[in-house]
Every structure is written in C-alpha cells, then in structure tokens.
Design a protein with these regions (language model features):
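Active-site rim/adjacent substrate-binding subdomains
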Residues: 1-158
C-alpha cells in the first residue's frame, strides 16, 4: 500500500480526541486501505506501534509489530509455542512478532493476573517526537480490547 508521512508533535490532530471507527457496515475497503497504509508506515518507520492520528487520521485505531515478550529479543518461537497460538488473533505467521490492529481500543489496567499492579519506569519513544526518549512510569500489565482488521473482537494483554 502506501507509506504515509508521520505527523510531528504540535499538529492539532495529535491533541484532539479521536473518533470511534464506525463498524456498523463492517470493515470497509477504505478502512482496509487505512490499516494497510498504517502497517506499511509502521514497517518503514522501524517503530513498534502507530495510531491513526499519527498519520493525520483522527480515528480510534492502532497497529503494532512487537517482539514477543515471552522470548529473548529476536528469538524465534519454538514450534510447540507456535502451535498453541496458531489462529489466535494478533499473532503473525512468522512466530517471532506479535502483529495486530486494534480498532476502537479500550485499555484496562486493573485485575492483573498476579493480583497486583507494579509501576515500572522505562524509556519510551514516539514516532511523532523523533529522536527523543522519555522515562515514563507504566504498569507492568495492561489489557486492550477492541476489534481486529476483520471486525472481530480482539483482546491483547501483557
């Protein structure tokens, strides 16, 4: 598809609330094109996540392409792990990265599996603020629900 320019901090589209994506008619060809453009833009950027407003579209969706946190960085998944995850939404076929699109995401940070939340300070970057890393406090667990690129429910957590 198309690699779109990434909007830089200060642009109003990054500061305004995003609009819910209307899925009443299913995933439209226009939405499929937007998602494909976002995936291509993310791949070209070298980032791990991209929201629609970062390419100037004020809609509520994002794409990710992240290393699987259950493995050492860059390590391939063993075949038995691939088999247990095969066909689950949000998993790429290469067995290395978690690749997903989440439409109309809802973030939850309560009810972690271990029963407690821990704040962790880590460095984080943003494609809309190029060349800068920030030390941010994040919970060690979060869950996001929404709809995938086929309009089916998806839940990602970690």
């Amino acid at each position: 598809m198309t690699v779109r320019p990434i909007v830089i901090a200060g642009d109003p589209v990054l500061h305004n609330p995003t609009e819910l994506v209307d899925l009443s008619a299913g995933v439209t060809p226009e939405l499929r094109t937007l998602i494909a453009d976002m995936v291509d833009t993310l791949a070209a950027s070298g980032g791990v996540g991209l929201s629609a407003n970062q390419i100037g579209v004020g809609k509520r969706l994002f794409v990710i392409d992240c290393p699987d946190t259950d493995l050492p960085e860059g390590a391939p998944m063993p075949p038995e792990m691939i088999a247990t995850r095969a066909g689950k939404p949000g998993w790429s076929s290469d067995g290395v990265n978690q690749v997903a699109c989440v439409i109309n995401p809802v973030l939850t940070v309560d009810n972690p599996p271990n029963g407690r939340q821990i704040l962790m300070r880590e460095g984080e970057g943003c494609l809309s603020v190029p060349g800068v890393q920030f030390a941010l406090d994040r919970y060690d667990w979060a869950q996001v629900t929404g709809f995938n690129e086929q309009g089916k429910p998806i839940t990602l957590s970690g």
